[in-house]
UniProtKB/Swiss-Prot annotation:
Essential for recycling GMP and indirectly, cGMP. Pfam families: Guanylate_kin. PANTHER family: GUANYLATE KINASE, GUANYLATE KINASE-RELATED. GO terms for molecular function: ATP binding; guanylate kinase activity. It is found in: Cytoplasm. It catalyses: GMP + ATP = GDP + ADP. Belongs to the guanylate kinase family. ATP binds at residues 23-30. This is Guanylate kinase. InterPro entries: GK/Ca_channel_bsu (IPR008145), Guanylate_kin-like_dom (IPR008144), Guanylate_kinase (IPR017665), Guanylate_kinase_CS (IPR020590), P-loop_NTPase (IPR027417). SUPFAM superfamilies: P-loop containing nucleoside triphosphate hydrolases. The keyword Membrane does not apply.
Length: 209
């Protein structure tokens, strides 16, 4: 799936780009993104999200997450400091992408990657200020997704059911994305996404919304 409406242009006209990579839990997108950062010959920068949850052992503020108090997060949310944010009700915590994180990367000529869920991606697409490259990663079928989630061995039946229901709803938004990647092999998925980004360096920013 791609968007033919983007026109050719000199990449120096827009050196920084926003890239959204989404996909259901269990699709392997985090692994793909980590490998993409290492292997792709594009100046990538992974956006660091903000959260109200407590740091886990070994996590570093500003590197893994920006750890904010609930009060600070709410203050910044009211100031419209987030590109997108949401509360994960099952955890009682907030997560979001700070505008200054994105702006700093774009102004430095980086291709800023947002590894965010569909809800966050739709919020970005609805903001005319951003015209991101949008990529949806999934395992090819709901059956394969269920198999991968079960193989993790970390999900209760109720949690598994909830994740699959969320994934089914997220798949309904696939048409809002410019590119679809079926992650049957991490190496192949990384190669496909890297080629997409290399091709996009020759086009003007566009979005499919």
């Amino acid at each position: 799936m791609n968007d033919p409406s983007c026109s050719s242009a000199d990449e120096t006209a827009h050196p920084g780009r926003l890239v959204i990579i989404s996909g259901p839990s269990g699709a392997g997108k985090s692994t793909v993104v980590k490998q993409l950062m290492k292997r792709c010959d594009v100046p990538l920068q992974l956006s660091v999200s903000a959260t109200t949850r407590e740091p886990r052992p070994g996590e570093i503020h500003g590197q893994d997450y920006f750890f904010l108090s609930h009060e600070e997060f709410e203050r910044r949310r009211k100031l419209n400091d987030f590109v997108e944010c949401k509360q994960v009700f099952s955890m009682g915590q907030w997560y979001g992408t700070l505008k200054d994180q994105v702006a700093t990367g774009l102004n430095a000529g980086k291709w800023v990657i947002l590894e965010i869920d569909v809800q966050g991606a739709m919020a970005v697409l609805d903001d005319p200020h951003y015209r991101p490259v949008t990529i949806f990663v999934h395992p090819g079928s709901m059956e394969e997704l269920e198999r991968r989630l079960r193989n993790r061995g970390t999900e209760s039946e109720s949690s598994l059911t909830a994740r699959l229901e969320t994934a089914a709803a997220e798949m309904q938004c696939l048409s809002r994305y410019q590119y679809e990647i079926i992650n049957e092999s991490v190496d192949n998925a990384v190669t496909e996404i890297c080629q997409i980004l290399l091709d996009q360096r020759k086009t003007t920013p566009c979005s499919k919304n």
